[in-house]
Amino acid sequence: MWPNSILVLMTLLISSTLVTGGGVKGEEKRVCPPDYVRCIRQDDPQCYSDNDCGDQEICCFWQCGFKCVLPVKDNSEEQIPQSKV
């Protein structure tokens, strides 16, 4: 039962960091930077939400555990111009 509980908890924590709410128009979205580290085990969390971090940082799963990190700009809504064929 213990491993299943940890799996459910981690799934909820990861999914909550992926959900972005609608902000003020013109406000830049704050998203977690890409993390390319493969982990053998997870570190103890240093944060549980953005409220646990400083003004400029957000709580992200980063290098094997939840940590306060500087966000990156979200370019997902910027339209890429199509080439003229």
From Swiss-Prot:
Q: Name one GO biological process term.
A: defense response to bacterium
List keywords of the entry alphabetically: Antibiotic, Antimicrobial, Disulfide bond, Protease inhibitor, Secreted, Serine protease inhibitor, Signal
**Cysteine disulfide partners in this protein:** C32-C60, C39-C64, C47-C59, C53-C68
List the PROSITE patterns. WAP
Q: In which tissues is it expressed?
A: Constitutively expressed in tongue.
Q: Which domain of life is it from?
A: Eukaryota
Single annotated GO MF? serine-type endopeptidase inhibitor activity
Q: Which InterPro entries match?
A: Elafin-like_sf (IPR036645), WAP_dom (IPR008197)
Where is the protein localized? Answer: Secreted
TM annotation in the entry: none
Residue ranges of domain WAP in the record: 25-72
Instruction: Tell me which GO cellular component terms the UniProt record holds.
Output: extracellular region
> In the UniProt record, does the keyword Disulfide bond occur?
yes
Major place of residence: secreted
**Endpoints of the signal sequence:** 1-21
User: What does the record give as the function of this protein?
Assistant: Antibacterial protein which inhibits the growth of E.coli and S.aureus. Putative acid-stable proteinase inhibitor.
Q: What is this protein called?
A: WAP four-disulfide core domain protein 12
Lineage, opening ranks: Eukaryota, Metazoa, Chordata, Craniata, Vertebrata
